[in-house]
């Protein structure tokens, strides 16, 4: 099957549906979706095949995690199904071929326990060579997801698929949903917004009446979004 057939395959969409509702079955909206899931799955399949798919509405909230406040944008179940079918069946299998084995983030079957095992292995190897003479460097990229440039992320992903037309179309659609309304910016601020550091948490304090859709910034992805997790482990800049 080609990439379009893989993403649109009813069995793959069904698997994506099961993953998408797994942690939210207690929600009323999820329960309503589950009552008619077959009809919705085939509607999604039809929209994908006819290129009529549109991004659904989102909900914003904040997550307090390890002493940090993270701005989260939640998407509808329909959109989650599309993301999972695309990422789980097409993007991640290809991305895995191009990342180091010790990268355990967002990779099924690895995770924190696997990362701990690999960390211990590296510690033992280092001790055998150098004993206690050494140190560990711990780093973090501040506002990493907030400042991912769409053009670069999309270009690098498309390289893995020889600029496939279907992958190009669906990535373009999803990235359009990531765009940030920066109508509140002056012309001078807008001219440098792609290189200036963006802070989504501060952005949420901007009055809604200033966000009128006149200026859009093609930078930043949503934390927790399935595609964002793939981009996070492969984004080269």
Locate the predicted segments by residue:
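Non-catalytic, polymerase-adjacent accessory regions of viral genome-replication enzymes
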Residues: 1-47
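Active-site-proximal segment of RNA-dependent polymerases
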Residues: 3, 89-150
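Glycine-/proline-rich flexible loop or hinge segments
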Residues: 20-31, 62-73, 100-102
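Conserved pre-motif C helix in the palm subdomain of viral-like polymerases
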Residues: 69-100, 214-237
């Amino acid at each position: 099957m080609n990439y379009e057939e893989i993403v649109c395959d009813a069995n793959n969409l069904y698997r994506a549906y099961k993953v998408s509702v797994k942690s939210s079955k207690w929600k009323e909206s999820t329960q309503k979706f589950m009552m008619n899931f077959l009809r919705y799955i085939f509607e999604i399949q039809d929209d994908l095949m006819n290129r009529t798919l549109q991004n659904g509405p989102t909900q914003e909230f904040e997550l307090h995690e390890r002493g940090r406040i993270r701005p989260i944008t939640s998407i509808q179940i329909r959109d989650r199904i599309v993301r999972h079918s695309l990422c789980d069946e097409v993007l991640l299998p290809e991305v895995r071929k191009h990342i180091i084995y010790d990268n355990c983030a967002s990779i099924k079957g690895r995770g924190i326990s696997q990362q701990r095992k690999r960390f211990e292995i590296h510690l033992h190897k280092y001790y055998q060579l150098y004993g206690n003479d050494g140190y560990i460097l711990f780093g973090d990229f501040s506002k990493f997801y907030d400042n991912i440039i769409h053009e670069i992320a999309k270009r690098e992903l498309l390289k893995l698929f020889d600029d496939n037309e279907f992958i190009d179309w669906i990535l373009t659609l999803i990235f359009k949903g990531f765009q940030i309304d920066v109508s509140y910016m002056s012309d001078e601020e807008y001219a440098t917004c792609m290189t200036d550091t963006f802070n989504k948490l501060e952005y949420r304090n901007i009055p809604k009446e200033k966000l009128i859709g006149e200026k859009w910034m093609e930078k930043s992805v949503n934390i927790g979004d399935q595609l964002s997790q793939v981009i996070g482990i492969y984004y080269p800049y």
